[in-house]
């Protein structure tokens, strides 16, 4: 329908993919440009959740099966299904109840009059579409910086654990360690805190410049700074970096020599054609048909068989820091 409408306006398009629509926004004016902006807004993944809700609702008016036990392949974490409730947009609107009642009553003219962006309103109202059964309530919570805590604990990074025993300002403390600045000088809006935060999120599992870029680092630092950020974070976290290499060595020893190695609180070994990693909880991660391979950089690495990013059974190449990610996320799941 939209293509037909554009044809009536004298504009022929082969595709309405995001890139094509963005180009039309730049190169058109008036109602065409406005329509393309609306198209972009309505294609937001969060708004599409309403369609998922409609598809998933059962005869009793409720949605069932939103969480799959042990849904994640290698870590065993719970997996979101159907509506993906693990990543619902946050609420920031002050008059959320008013917006909800207007949409519920179908008074979209007032929504357009009172709010700048109808799609943004719909996005914020997604959480309010979930209603607990009578006599029950939803409690929404999570563990604060759980992966940073678990990684610091497993790797024995003393200052990280000390910070979590106290104020828990891991991003500020990371920036303080990276840039040798007193933590009291690093406020929430500080550019140093922003650097500490993005480095903490991007570098914990061996990430380098590419990981920083994917986390949005170029929004506030120059590209030439990225290598220095990676090095500063690794210098500030020597035990975590060493943990990557210890796990890497243990995994290779298990595959090549069938050797059992204890690395801190985890045990790595080979059994019945599988690489095994025993977690502090006693649960064991298993990697099918592991073998030594040469990676794309020409270095020796371990690969195993599993479901790849293409959702097909394939051979997956891995390395120490990636195994650490599995270990940390699985341990966090056990918590």
Q: Each PLM stretch: what is its role?
A:
Residues 186, 212, 225-226:
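Small-residue helix-packing motif on alpha-helices
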Residues 2, 6, 39, 197, ...:
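Short amphipathic alpha-helical coiled-coil/interface segments
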Residues 1-186, 243-335:
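Acidic, glycine-rich two-metal-ion catalytic cores of nucleic acid-processing enzymes
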Residues 1-8, 174, 178, 194-211:
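Core structural elements
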Residues 216-229:
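Short, basic interhelical loop/turn and adjoining N-cap
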Residues 179-200, 215, 322-323:
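Active-site-adjacent structural elements in folded domains
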Residues 142-143, 209-212, 229-232, 335:
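Catalytic palm active-site di-aspartate
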Residues 209, 236, 240-241:
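Active-site-proximal binding-pocket segments
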């Amino acid at each position: 329908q939209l293509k037909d409408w554009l044809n009536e306006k004298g504009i022929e398009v082969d595709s309405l993919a995001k890139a094509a629509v963005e180009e039309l926004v730049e190169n058109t004016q008036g109602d065409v440009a406005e329509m393309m902006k609306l198209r972009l807004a309505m294609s937001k993944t969060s708004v599409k959740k309403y369609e998922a809700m409609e598809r998933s609702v059962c005869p009793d008016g409720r949605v069932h099966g939103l969480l799959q036990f042990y849904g994640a392949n290698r870590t065993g974490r719970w997996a979101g299904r159907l509506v993906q409730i693990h990543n619902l947009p946050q609420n920031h609107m002050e008059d959320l109840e008013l917006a909800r009642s207007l949409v519920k009553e179908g008074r979209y003219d007032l929504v357009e009059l009172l709010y700048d962006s109808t799609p943004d309103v719909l996005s914020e109202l997604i959480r309010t579409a979930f209603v607990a059964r009578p006599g029950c309530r939803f409690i929404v919570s999570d563990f604060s910086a759980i992966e940073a805590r678990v990684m610091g604990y497993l790797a024995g990074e003393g200052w990280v654990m000390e910070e979590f025993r106290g104020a828990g300002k891991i991003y500020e403390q990371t920036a303080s360690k990276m840039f040798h600045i007193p933590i009291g000088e690093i406020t929430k809006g500080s550019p140093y805190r922003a650097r500490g935060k993005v480095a903490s999120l991007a570098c914990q599992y061996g990430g380098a410049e590419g990981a920083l870029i994917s986390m949005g680092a170029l929004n506030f630092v120059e590209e030439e700074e990225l290598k220095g950020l990676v090095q500063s974070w690794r210098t500030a976290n020597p035990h975590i970096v060493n943990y990557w290499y210890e796990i890497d060595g243990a995994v290779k020893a298990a595959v090549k020599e069938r050797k059992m190695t204890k690395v801190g609180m985890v045990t790595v070994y080979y059994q019945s054609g599988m690489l095994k990693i025993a977690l502090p909880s006693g649960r064991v991660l298993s990697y099918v048909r592991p073998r030594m391979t040469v990676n794309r950089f020409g270095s020796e690495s371990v690969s195993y068989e599993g479901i790849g990013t293409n959702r097909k059974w394939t051979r997956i190449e891995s390395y120490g820091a990636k195994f650490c990610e599995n270990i940390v996320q699985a341990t966090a799941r056990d918590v």
